[in-house]
């Protein structure tokens, strides 16, 4: 399959760095805690809604008095979490940028590779969402983005978004629903970043 003239080498897979692995592990542990808490609330009579929290993307619950409840925002998140790169994508991106700047300053000018935006890795839904979040980092390209690549990427993201939305509608698994919500949010954020690049 031709990729609009792009080299296949441009899309080669690289294993996650130690920092990325720690971030993924922390996210996995956080999702597990959210799932356990949601299970406890469901056993207490709470209902799972077909909506997600606008702040964190977690599936919302409703108690018998019809009060809306977000397990992640109201039980897990705190001010400390906002600075934790394992729980906050912005903090993780900032830490990754600091690490890249520190490693780039150690290299002599002649041996410094040209900066390339990270490419999302096809992984489990949660990993794919994390890869998409990492791919939307703010470094502006030195040249205008290739419109063919942008269009191809936008089409792929829209297809993935449509697929995830359809799957979410038919999903009966709490864990799958949580992961699909994360994927939908990551696709939407990536599409927003693409639109910003085009303007």
Curated annotation (Swiss-Prot):
Broad class of the protein's primary localization: cytoplasm
Assembly and binders: Homodimer.
Localisation: Cytoplasm
Cofactor(s) it depends on: Zn(2+)
Effect seen on changing residue 191 to A: Ubiquitous intracellular location
Residue ranges of the motif Nuclear export signal: 173-194
UniProt region (Disordered), positions on chain: 100-125
Gene Ontology annotations of biological process type: cell division; mitotic cell cycle
Protein name: Protein ZNRD2
Function per UniProt: Might play a role in mitosis. Antigenic molecule. Could be a centromere-associated protein. May induce anti-centromere antibodies.
Record: residues binding Zn(2+): 53, 56, 70, 73
Modification Phosphoserine occurs at: 94
Gene (UniProt): ZNRD2
Entry keyword set: Acetylation, Cell cycle, Cell division, Cytoplasm, Metal-binding, Mitosis, Phosphoprotein, Zinc
A GO term from the CC aspect: cytoplasm
């Amino acid at each position: 399959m031709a990729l609009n003239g792009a080299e296949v080498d441009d899309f080669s897979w690289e294993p996650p760095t130690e920092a990325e692995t720690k971030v993924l592990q922390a996210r996995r542990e956080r999702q597990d805690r959210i799932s356990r808490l949601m299970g406890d609330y469901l056993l207490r009579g709470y209902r799972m809604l077909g909506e997600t929290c606008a702040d964190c993307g977690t599936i919302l619950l409703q108690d018998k008095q019809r009060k809306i409840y977000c397990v992640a925002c109201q039980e897990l998140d705190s001010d400390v979490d906002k600075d934790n790169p394992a729980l906050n994508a912005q903090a993780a991106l900032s830490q990754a940028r600091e690490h890249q700047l520190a490693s780039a300053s150690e290299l002599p000018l002649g041996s410094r590779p040209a900066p390339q935006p990270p490419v999302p890795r096809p992984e489990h839904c949660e990993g794919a969402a994390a890869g998409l979040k990492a791919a939307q980092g703010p470094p502006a390209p030195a040249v205008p983005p290739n419109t063919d690549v942008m269009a191809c990427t936008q089409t792929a993201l829209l297809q993935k978004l449509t697929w995830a939305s359809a799957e979410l509608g038919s999903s009966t698994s709490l864990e799958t629903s949580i992961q699909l919500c994360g994927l939908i949010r990551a696709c939407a954020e990536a599409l927003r970043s693409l639109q910003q690049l085009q303007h």
